[in-house]
From Swiss-Prot:
GO terms for biological process: endosome transport via multivesicular body sorting pathway; late endosome to vacuole transport; protein transport. PANTHER family: CHARGED MULTIVESICULAR BODY PROTEIN (PTHR10476). The record marks R214 as: Interaction with STAMBP. Keywords: Coiled coil, Cytoplasm, Endosome, Lipoprotein, Membrane, Myristate, Protein transport, Transport. Probable core component of the endosomal sorting required for transport complex III (ESCRT-III). ESCRT-III components are thought to multimerize to form a flat lattice on the perimeter membrane of the endosome. Several assembly forms of ESCRT-III may exist that interact and act sequentially. Residues 22-54 form a coiled coil. This is Charged multivesicular body protein 3. Signal peptide: none annotated. The gene is chmp3. Residues 203-207, 219-220 are annotated as: Interaction with STAMBP. Residues 168-169 are annotated as: Important for autoinhibitory function. It is found in: Cytoplasm, Cytosol; Membrane; Endosome; Late endosome membrane.
Length: 220
């Protein structure tokens, strides 16, 4: 606290260094998230192969959809890392400008990057806090969030899902399901095991639900 109870403003250099540290910390969170999702993806792909061997095409399609959604989630996380790197580079530039002019400068590049970062649920709270601090410091202006992003993503998912599902099934089953990139219409190969399949159907369904829950938790 300063004189008369007023809070003393922090030096701009300290602010920039603190923002950079917070962003690097969130990047490590994103890296862990990506690794977790990718590990789960490999489990799902193994399950697709097992379901294909048993002749369970419906399970294969359900699992392939999970892979599609997971890949989209990972792509978004990588895009967010790129935005974070952009902000970090801008912070370095701010320090260079600060040494010359003695003050922080407004940056449209940081503004655009932060607009994208505040939309990511995994780091939303931290990015909102940083945005407020940057607005107060004069680096960015008040941001208006794009409320149409979710709808746009859903439309894109509908358009590309079938093609991507077919591609994944073809890739994971080594061509047992259809021909990439055309639509999968082929029947699955005959089941390798016929004896205990009926008894294992319920267990397989439970495994599918558990895997779906784990992937959903990682993406949320």
């Amino acid at each position: 606290m300063g004189l008369f109870g007023k809070t003393q403003e922090r030096p701009p250099k300290d602010l920039v260094n603190e923002w950079s540290l917070k962003i690097r910390k969130e990047m490590r969170v994103i890296d862990r998230q990506i690794r977790d999702i990718q590990r789960e993806q490999e489990k799902v792909k193994r399950s697709i192969k097992e379901s294909a061997k048993k002749g369970n095409r419906e399970a294969c399609v359900i699992l392939a959809k999970e892979v599609v959604q997971s890949k989209k989630a990972v792509n978004k996380l990588y895009a967010s890392k790129a935005h974070m790197n952009s902000v970090l580079m801008s912070m370095k530039n701010q320090l260079a400008v600060l040494r010359v002019s003695g003050s922080l400068q407004k940056s449209t590049e940081v503004m655009k990057a932060m607009q994208n970062l505040v939309k990511l649920p995994e780091i939303q709270a931290t990015m909102r806090e940083l945005s407020k601090e940057m607005m107060k410091a004069g680096i960015i202006e008040e941001m208006l969030e794009d409320t149409f992003e979710g709808m746009e993503d859903q439309d894109e998912m509908e358009e590309q899902a079938e093609m991507e599902i077919d591609r994944i099934l073809f890739e994971v089953t080594a061509g047992a399901l259809g021909k990439a990139p055309s639509k999968v219409t082929d029947a699955l190969p005959e089941p390798e095991i016929t004896g205990a399949m009926a008894a294992s159907d319920e267990e397989e369904e439970e495994d599918l639900e558990a895997m779906h829950s784990r992937l959903a938790a990682l993406r949320s």
